[in-house]
Amino acid sequence: MGSMTTPADVHDVRDPEQPGRLLAIERDGLIPLLRARAEEDFALPVGACPGWSVRSVLAHCSAALTRVVENRFEDGVFSPESNDRDIAERDGWSNARVVDELERGMTEAGPVIAGAGGKLDGLALGEWVHAGDVRDAFGEPGAYGGAGLPDALALLARITRERGHVPLHADLDDLDEPLRLGESGGERPPGRFIGDGPTLVRLYTGRPVDGAEFELVGVEAKDLNIFG
């Protein structure tokens, strides 16, 4: 008798198109937003990334995606020092040029990530989260949510399971079925989250959750952070 596959388990099967789809969805919403902003808005501080402005975050994201497209992964790539160098290399660029590079990267990186066997999937999720950081800095609604949220949550669930992260069962306002995150071997009883998807994303990425209504039982917020 075969084992039953639950909706929560389906997320374990990698969809190679998912990271690129997430980038494309976010591109279609974020790029017009950026092109409509005043130049001075690019200097706004980004609370989730101390010391970085909106422009810094965008330059980091566009550089990372360009590296993916051009297959440039030297030793130390994506370290804080490497990220700072990538941003500094774009200091002489106009804001429009940074946005153009970001648009190209969000378009062209998807097929490369799809063919990488999963090792770059986390980068796509990180890009989507940084787009939320920018929306948050602008005071725009929908940060860490929107049309890309279902793909982002599925990616987050699979990445946390692959990493053997602390187990959590999430009952989300945004999904019909509970989402299972973290290791599933049964060594640890799972924690429980009740709330919305954007708040769950904030918890897993170390973003502030001030004012959000949610329940978290059996695990501490600091233990969920995949970037911590």
What positions do the PLM features span?
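Active-site-adjacent scaffolding segments
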Residues: 2-118, 122-129
